[in-house]
Amino acid sequence: MHNTAIKTAPNDNVAIVATPTGLKRGSIVLGTTVLVEEIPMGHKVALQTLEMGDEVRRYGQVIGYATRTIEKGSWVNEGNISLPEPPKLEVIEYKPVLPPVEDDEELKAQLRKVSFMGYRNADGSVGTKNVLAITTSVQCVAGITNFIENKIRKELLPLYPNVDDVVAFNHSYGCGVAIDAPGAIVPIRTIKNIAQNPNFGGEVMIIGLGCEKLRPEKIAPPSGEGGLSILYLQDERFEGFYEMVDGIMELAETHLQKLNQRQRTRCSVADLVVGMQCGGSDAFSGLTGNPVSGFAADLIVKAGGTVFFSEVTEVRDAIHLLVPRAMDETVAQKLKDEMAWYDNYLYQGQADRSANTTPGNKGGGLSNIVEKALGSVAKSGTSPIVDVVSPGEKVRKKGLNFVATPASDFACGTLQLAAGMNMHVFITGRGTPYGLNMVPVIKVSSNSKLANRWHDLIDFDAGPVAFGEKTIEEMGWALFHLILEVASGTKKVATDKLGLYNDLVLFNPGPLT
């Protein structure tokens, strides 16, 4: 393979080594740069000599400052660059840079004729799976619900072939918490909104203990919406464990009977609600996987659908690029408000956004959170941001939304479920078996080395973009079509084939008691 290094923007003074084996000292890249040391795949090479204090630029943006002289051809990494200050929220002005609305009317018209086969719900939402969800109001019942989940899967699901799975949503909330504290609204509305996810068909089954602070009625949908049942384990009619089990199994059957009647029907792409997330990111994430996913996101938005991206600490250092994409000044201010809230949240915990990057990120070539954030936002595509959704809330508008979440894969996925996603696209460069059993998770690899090694864990390889074998546009269309196939149930994702699922993790900024 040829010596390959990728320069992201014309004024960058570093390039990314793309050769899978890395490059040896003496290798020549981009015509004139001779490596003075061995540099691993994904890491940066200096394209000019940088003196102490000089800007280090990638994506056309400053990602750091040289802490000492860095010779041309040297390895640029977290050891020789310093972290810049984050963009100051108070000085970022709203100067809209929105794409012309008339440029792609023909494409929009074509996309709005595209369809997939989904489960239409009574409230108009559409599911891509047909799942019996058991919601819990307190951690105390988790042992019972785990037992019940296995029993239903073994004994009842075979009798209801149209139901894909049963899922118990256990969590650590419900008691021993300051239930009336301002931050308590986040976990409470998260639990409530997850129970109403479109993939559950409007069937809400809540198991409570009976004495908990979080009353099941508080997380139930408004009266009259869908099928709701609440069962307390402390109900005096239950004599012992097996009577509890029988009571829950009887309740589950009433919901399974209704879910089993659901049938897939032709639905518009406008019915898709796709959550974009990245985890285990590397230097290629912002070159391949995220831009490809962003292109697919733009297609879904053009078709009238809903897409959201998240992870506050992974957009904080790119907020100056996002504010101009806000649909109006109100949305721009909401973006800045969510950044400010999280800045304060981290400050109260005596941390800052630099705590985000992992050893894996750095091993994959990401020197700091600035570089990571600039690549992370590429998965949002180029569409205008129509709304900002606070943690635990549902999306309110079609189009591209920012759903404010922590960057933790598990907390982010949980909050995106609460926001109403019926499809999940997860981009990784280092690799993670992350999966959710409530929603299909399409795993996108940023590099072919990972995709080849994890051939049965990765659903889509965006790596060919790095070497010019495919364009972002070509791969974006391919991912778009894969999303439709998975949403229709005609193709299974790797996590569903292998049964690899993570627990949900509630984000609780409120105090424990």
Q: Where are these predicted regions, by residue range?
A:
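Metallocofactor- and cofactor-centric catalytic cores in central/energy metabolism, strongly enriched
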Residues: 1-423, 427, 432, 438-513
